Amino acid sequence: MDDPGARPPGAWVRRHRTVYLCTVDLLRITGTGPLAGEVPISGSKNAALPVMAASLLADEPLELVNVPHIEDIGVMAAMLRHLGVEAERPGPGRWHLHAAHVQAADVGAELTRQMRGSLLLLGALLARAGEAAIAKPGGDDIGMRRVEQHLEGLRLMGADVTETGSAFVARARRLRGAHIFLDIPTVTGTENLLMAATLAEGITVISNAAREPHVYDLVRCLVGMGARISGAGTERIVVEGRGGAPLHGSLHHLSSDYVEAGTYLAAAAATGGSITVSGMRPTDLRSFTNKLRSAGCRVVEGASHVRLAAAPLHAVDMTTWPHPGFATDLQPQFGALMTQARGVSIISEALYENRFRHVPELRRMGARIAIEGRSAIVNGPTALRGTAVSVPDIRSGAALVIAALCADGTTEMAGAFHLDRGYEKLEEKLRSLGATVERVRSATPGQETRDLSGVIGD
């Protein structure tokens, strides 16, 4: 099926009229030693989702290149189609988005529950249609996500914004420029306010703005569509609004996924391997590669690649922080790596309070990890052993993949669909580096009413 979002994580299949089976993907990984080789890095999911939402701001086509073929992209495309956007995938890595006419201003829970990125539609839809109703999103349960800053920023721009028990609703006859100070440099909040500000009247200043690479990517796209924005990549972004006039079409090449690159580098380091990740910006990953060097790895950066040669690992401490600090999306992977390092490492999570969901599964594999508040204390090195584990979210799944690659025996990972939401061609890329990985689809009896975000079919 061409649209990755059209394939649900579990699909109901009718058998003999009365018996329903639920198909579930398992990832089976056998630890086979060091990874070696070169892996090309896919386009950034975190850049693709806001850029896709930005298509609502133009009445001409937006052509995207280097888009990863993952589940969340298909879900975003489905939401855009619901709003009346022409969303097509003409070829690998490409999307054609044309919002000539916005035909709806609401996105229901049947779509938004599948991922957190649905909230990115709020600012763009409000700016284009004058109203937006977005059912409260789903996605990874990694803790509180501060939505109030999005809403308050839109209110400062003149919108009437309410939060019901099930949705965020915003209306504005016209948006006006405002000076918005973010208490915390929220990435999604910065992106939402940027998109709303492009069509507002007057100048909007966003202070304490997020500086993540995908925010910069969104600004590049918006400027290519005719927006007037300065300060991207800094804490102060200035947007000169177009007074309601839509943006024009553009061709935009997405940046590569530094989180994917960091995941493969951590896997190579954990297995004692030597790999090159190519087609990415090493500067996006600098806080992570600096920690790898501190842990003993040999890391060399090129213009568009990073080469790592593993060495005996020693424990280092790490605290997540907004960019250019250590990315929270790489914290679970680094924690898995530290199970193979000599000594005690303290992994602290400053951004989300529920981002250690992988730890119980790592313990099942033999890891010695204690949780104290927002920190994980990792004692290493540990001889991990393969067993059955469950993937709770995307990045926790990546941590479990790393653990499985350096474990003795075979690990079976239930909930592999989480990995499909964030990693393109995961098995194929791991196999190219010498890993033993296979996907197993099993069928288990289930009830028709169980919610797997799936479909009932014959």
Residue ranges and their predicted role:
Residues R15-D458:
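Structural preference for solvent-exposed beta-strand-turn elements
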